[in-house]
Amino acid sequence: MQCALYDAGRCRSCQWIVQPIRDQLSAKTADLKGLLADFSVEQWCAPVSGPEQAFRNKAKMVVSGSVEKPLLGMLHRDGTPEDLSDCPLYPDTFAPVFATLKPFIARAGLTPYNVARKRGELKYILLTESQFDGGMMLRFVLRSETKLAQLRAALPWLQAQLPQLKVITANIQPVHMAIMEGETEIFLTEQQALAERFNDVPLWIRPQSFFQTNPVVASHLYATARDWVRQLPVHHMWDLFCGVGGFGLHCATPEMTLTGIEIAPEAIACAKQSAAELGLTNLHFQALDSTQFATGQGEVPELVLVNPPRRGIGKALCDYLSQMAPEYIIYSSCNAQTMAKDIANLPGYRIERVQLFDMFPHTAHYEVLTLLTKTR
């Protein structure tokens, strides 16, 4: 991938960009095999990759500069702003949105937040696009509600220019820290969720729900999990750390009972909406802590699927799963290091299958799907 920002030394986020994708995949595979070297792996599946550029469905832009000439991008370590509107990781559909947002910020009088001075209102612009219908969700992350009336008043102009903006919100983040969003979300449109669809499975994206940023590879990841589950004699499963329900909704069948657990209520609202659309009445999604839910149960299903954050599932959940011993565990991880540590705490299981998914090209990061089977 060619990137003028990288070539000019203005951005180094894609640290592996000079390596061909083939070499990147080889390095990631070697890293994963090194982390799992202490375990016997029955089957290594071929890694899955997607497009090298224009693959992201989400942009997280720091707003800097002045209200008349805002910059959308990032701040370097020394506080110097960098405009990343032309980043080649974003699809072509993002450029006209960024170009329109800059004069809109001036129209609405949304002064960019100045980190050094602790002054200003607009901290971030968060933009998400649906691959299903091209609809977009735009979130203005503000320091306070001071400029909310001005934002509302100027909004009709923006919506006329960019009718693809289906969901628009103001998120209030009052803390002087590099935190992307606050707890308060104020909807500025009637529509509150973005429709998405992977592999003919309806999914929904709400403002404070996690959603994978690489739709092509994520679609392969969910489809692979579905295929693995269909090969197992499973009638009841848990989907822990389930997010908007991507794994569970793909794996579920009308005959299967599935419980999905996720701590974020916004994500659970999305999962419930999808389950209702699919007409699957044996799917139950609850907004709870996954570890607390699991360890509070007196019995487990045949299959437990986990998709934890980077920290992994942790020793308490590993100990519980070891004790209760479900027949199968499917572990989806964005941090193979913590996954390997967790697997070491599951001594009663063998690794039947592993597959790497290159969700984050040009970086050292990747996603991995692992099937663990109870040793007889």
UniProtKB/Swiss-Prot annotation:
It comes from the Bacteria. GO terms for biological process: rRNA base methylation. Keywords: 4Fe-4S, Iron, Iron-sulfur, Metal-binding, Methyltransferase, rRNA processing, S-adenosyl-L-methionine, Transferase. [4Fe-4S] cluster binds at C3, C11, C14, C87. It is an enzyme of class 2 (transferase). The keyword Iron applies. It holds the Pfam family tRNA_U5-meth_tr. GO terms for molecular function: 4 iron, 4 sulfur cluster binding; iron ion binding; rRNA (uridine-C5-)-methyltransferase activity. It catalyses: uridine(747) in 23S rRNA + S-adenosyl-L-methionine = 5-methyluridine(747) in 23S rRNA + S-adenosyl-L-homocysteine + H(+). Its EC number is 2.1.1.189. The active site is at C334. S-adenosyl-L-methionine binds at Q212, F241, E262, N307. The keyword Transferase applies. Catalyzes the formation of 5-methyl-uridine at position 747 (m5U747) in 23S rRNA. Belongs to the class I-like SAM-binding methyltransferase superfamily. RNA M5U methyltransferase family. RlmC subfamily. This is 23S rRNA (uracil(747)-C(5))-methyltransferase RlmC.
